[in-house]
Regions:
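An acidic- and aromatic-residue-enriched active-site/binding cleft used to recognize and process polar
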Residues: 62-66, 89, 110
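N-terminal "leader" segments that precede or initiate the main folded domain
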Residues: 1-7
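Domain-level recognition of nuclease-like catalytic cores that cleave nucleotide substrates
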Residues: 95-116
């Protein structure tokens, strides 16, 4: 599922209007960033407006937001540059190493994409 979320994010396969963080901040995606195939955040140099303010930084994607803790990102300064955490299940709030909260956006798999993936995987 996490790889599917990467695909959905990279190709903007989600409604581009009325996106909001889990805390109600309005989200406008300007640029999803460059996919990272190495260690570190999943996408570099994304451009996102949160409540009209432009943020440029990295994006991390997990199936569940609690994976942030499981992967140790809360203690890894490499992830302090994350400006938006993408998840399909926001089961916890996530924070930088200094305790500052990171905005989270819930993305779900559009039906037509999920059906296609189910057929592909078999």
């Amino acid at each position: 599922m996490e790889q599917l979320l990467h695909y959905i994010w990279k190709h903007k396969i989600f409604p581009l209007q009325e996106l909001k963080t889990t805390t109600g901040q309005k989200v406008e995606i300007i640029d999803t960033g460059l996919a990272n195939t190495n260690a570190g955040p999943d996408f570099f140099n994304a451009k996102v407006k949160l409540n009209g303010i432009l943020w440029i930084g990295n994006v991390e994607i997990h199936e569940r937001s609690s994976d942030w803790l499981k992967h140790g990102h809360h203690t890894d300064a490499t992830y302090d540059s994350v400006i938006l955490h993408i998840t399909s299940d926001a089961d916890i709030d996530v924070h930088r190493t200094n305790g500052e909260p990171i905005p989270q956006l819930i993305l779900t798999c559009p039906d037509y994409v999920c059906r296609s993936e189910e057929r592909r995987v078999g």
